[in-house]
């Protein structure tokens, strides 16, 4: 498997425009990234442009705060899938996790898993920078119990991104059969290698092209 095949080529900034998305899509076709990860408003366009290419369409749910109701997250998910999404990255209810309301957290994740109805992968963003190690472990266990396919470190919109320590902890917690996605601040091939060595099976990055070319990405995009 090539380096590009594990990267979700990502554009999630609120001011991302149509031309930016079309450029992202063309780059994904050229380099054969695993997916493009875009906000829900761009899913239909991405699905149309990527049909038959083998590149998946990933979108975000309850993003970036995770503070939507479960019903809202489920609606977002169904809507995204109806428009062509094949992967969804949802944000957990972080406050409920911190309040030790594990049943609420698990039900929230399960609401998205059930909305997917087997038509898309579900990745669960736990926002590691806001959690203790115990909370990270608990979040991962709840995601697995709810039927998620992946756990993911970060939105890229909070106080920090992926670290090798968090990836190792998440991999140890979920075991070998669940995906672990590193996102937030992964900007070079060296960053990717570090995350993969720690246990990541997918990378979320806006610097995908620079990464596969072995170049240093310019700018300070947290994703």
From Swiss-Prot:
What EC number(s) is this enzyme filed under? Answer: 4.1.2.4
Q: In which pathway does it act?
A: Carbohydrate degradation; 2-deoxy-D-ribose 1-phosphate degradation; D-glyceraldehyde 3-phosphate and acetaldehyde from 2-deoxy-alpha-D-ribose 1-phosphate: step 2/2
Q: Which GO terms describe its biological process?
A: 2-deoxyribose 1-phosphate catabolic process; carbohydrate catabolic process; deoxyribonucleotide catabolic process
Q: Which Pfam families match?
A: DeoC
Q: Which family does it belong to?
A: Belongs to the DeoC/FbaB aldolase family. DeoC type 1 subfamily.
> What is this protein for, i.e. what is its function?
Catalyzes a reversible aldol reaction between acetaldehyde and D-glyceraldehyde 3-phosphate to generate 2-deoxy-D-ribose 5-phosphate.
Q: What is this protein called?
A: Deoxyribose-phosphate aldolase
| Source organism per UniProt | Bacillus subtilis (strain 168)
